[in-house]
Amino acid sequence: SIHGTAPDVMEEMDAYRDLIREHISYECFQDDRFCRREDVDELVELMVEVMLLPDHGTVRIAGVEKPVAIVKNRFMKLNHEHIEYILTCLQSNTTKVGNIKAYLLTTLYNASMTISNYYTAEVNHDLYGSG
């Protein structure tokens, strides 16, 4: 349930949207030919939706209920590099995703923990991979 009046909620949404866009250097995606802005917008809106949830609630991440406060904290740590990483992962995913919203929430939640290992694996593959 959303507390307050509709204008209050809209203002809160706009404030979170601006904050998230600032964190991820949103304007840098405007001219990025590798990233579709609609994809970035979808991620931003999904994060905004979570930011509006009450802290005492839970969000399902990879099938596990996580405290909203922890998910919000994780989302607020995401930056431009994390969003690029998520978009790269999405583009290279070849398996069918049944619930795209759940998949994106999990990807956003895990991005800060998995980005370093992902790029290490990519470099190792490029340097020492199958030839």
Show where each model-derived region lies:
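Electrostatic interaction modules used in gene-expression and signaling proteins
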Residues: 1-131
